[in-house]
């Protein structure tokens, strides 16, 4: 039996079930750019510095990253464009030189990304967007479920805010409105995939000691494109949507290619799902469900091809957001994954559930406090994230926080029990 299979099996299962845990669902355009009446070019920028120190087990600096994001947009009647890019430089590899493997340093020390870069125009009654763009179908606080199109940068786990964690897709998107119904079709000729980093990184998803070969990404071809459609409508005060999406999975499937060797690859999957939301005045109710076919999971069965078995799954989540405290709110969510054709060899139960609670309050005009707890319910496995946010000026925000992980080494959060950290973030937008 593979000595890493039980750990990797459970990790891969829950990773695919529980997506990002962040404070809020961010707006699609973080820079807030708008065209003036004359259609002149507008520009914007964000400068950010993140500093983190891991204090559990081997104490070390785990982040000292400077980030700059620039954007411009313009256009005229019936035509608009946007271009944006982001550059990172992480000095932690100079501060704690030698702590991380060279492969991790090469992957994370310097980086430039083209962010949202697209053109918008109309063709009759249809609106079209071509280029690198965010396509966000999920609307839950703190979790990815129906947001199936987005790729994510997971090299710092699920800790960054969503607008920083999402990776735009190169896509063609067409939208059409008829009555109160909104139809959307997307085609992604060159998909982006989750970034999980290199073995030895702070939040690499497989246990330390696993031998991981280079990731295999599908070749660029018509057969390796992604596509899907979504319908949404307001019915009696309920915002309801349904979608179908066929894609090469943004998440990695770890193939067993040797006794202790794994290789991340991307399988073809199909997903059908929907979302629902309603504002009752005193609270907001939201829910999402996604049925996924074609995804495979690591198995303890020594006869399983490549150490994998196929499991069709249903992910669902229901949440309520209630205004409370001093200009704050409470968010409660229950989420679960159920295997439609459960195979016990994957090392999990047929239904794996969890819950989250988010408490937010304004302490003073400039200070805000927040705490997020996410826990699995089938076993001890949790993450706790208290923090305070200081609005130092109109365009300057500073955050101080702690990230605490707990549980068994096979758990989604427990495997990072020795990565507890304190951090600060300064963000200036202009």
Language-model features: locations:
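Transmembrane beta-strand segments of Gram-negative outer membrane beta-barrel proteins
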Residues: 31-56, 79-87
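Residues that define the transmembrane beta-barrel architecture of outer-membrane proteins
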Residues: 39, 62-66, 110-115, 166-170, ...
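Residues on the lipid-exposed face of transmembrane beta-strands in outer-membrane beta-barrel proteins
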Residues: 45, 68-74, 116-121, 172-176, ...
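Transmembrane beta-strands of outer-membrane beta-barrel pores
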Residues: 49-55, 76-78, 87-91, 123-125, ...
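Repeated loop/turn-to-beta-strand initiation elements of outer-membrane beta-barrel proteins
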Residues: 78-81, 125-128, 180-183, 237-240, ...
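Outer membrane beta-barrel
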Residues: 79-205, 236, 407
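Detector for outer-membrane/organellar transmembrane beta-barrel domains
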Residues: 245, 277-374
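Outer-membrane beta-barrel "beta-signal"
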Residues: 395-397, 401-404, 416-430
């Amino acid at each position: 039996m593979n000595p890493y299979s039980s750990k990797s099996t459970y990790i891969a299962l829950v990773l695919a079930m529980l997506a990002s845990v962040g404070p809020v669902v961010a707006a699609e355009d973080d820079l807030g750019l708008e065209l003036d009446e004359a259609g002149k070019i507008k520009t914007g920028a964000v400068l950010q510095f993140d500093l983190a120190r891991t204090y559990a087990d081997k104490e070390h600096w785990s982040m000292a990253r400077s980030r700059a994001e620039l954007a411009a947009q313009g256009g005229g009647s019936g035509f608009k464009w946007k271009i944006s890019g982001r550059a990172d430089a992480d000095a932690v590899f100079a501060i704690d030189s030698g702590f991380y493997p060279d492969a991790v340093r090469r992957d994370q020390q310097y980086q430039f990304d083209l962010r949202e870069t697209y053109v918008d125009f109309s063709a009759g009654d249809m609106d079209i967007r071509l280029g690198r763009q965010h396509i966000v179908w999920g609307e839950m606080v703190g979790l990815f479920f129906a947001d199936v199109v987005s790729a994510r940068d997971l090299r710092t786990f699920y800790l960054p805010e969503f607008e920083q964690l999402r990776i735009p897709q190169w896509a063609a998107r067409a939208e059409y409105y008829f009555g109160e119904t909104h139809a959307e079709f997307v085609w992604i000729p060159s998909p982006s995939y989750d970034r999980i980093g290199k073995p030895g990184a702070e939040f690499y998803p497989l246990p330390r000691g696993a031998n991981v070969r280079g990731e295999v990404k599908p070749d660029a071809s018509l057969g390796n494109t992604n596509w899907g459609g979504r319908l949404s409508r307001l019915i009696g005060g309920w915002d309801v949507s349904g979608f179908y999406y066929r894609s090469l999975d943004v998440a990695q499937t770890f193939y067993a290619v040797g006794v202790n060797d794994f290789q991340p690859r991307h399988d073809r999957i199909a997903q059908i799902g929907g979302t629902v939301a309603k504002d009752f005045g005193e609270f907001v109710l939201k829910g999402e469900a996604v049925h996924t076919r074609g995804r495979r999971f690591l198995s303890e069965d020594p006869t399983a091809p490549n150490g994998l078995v196929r499991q069709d799954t249903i992910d669902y989540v229901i949440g309520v957001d209630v205004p409370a405290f001093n200009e704050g709110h409470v968010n409660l969510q229950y989420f679960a994954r159920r295997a439609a054709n459960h195979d016990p060899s994957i090392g999990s139960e047929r239904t794996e559930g969890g819950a989250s609670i988010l408490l937010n309050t304004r302490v003073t005009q400039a200070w805000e406090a927040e705490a997020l707890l996410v826990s699995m319910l089938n076993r001890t496995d949790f993450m706790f994230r208290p923090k305070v946010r200081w609005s130092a000026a109109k365009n300057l925000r500073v955050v101080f926080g702690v990230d605490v992980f707990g549980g068994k080494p096979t758990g989604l959060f427990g495997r990072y029990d020795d990565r507890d950290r304190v951090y600060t973030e300064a963000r200036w937008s202009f």
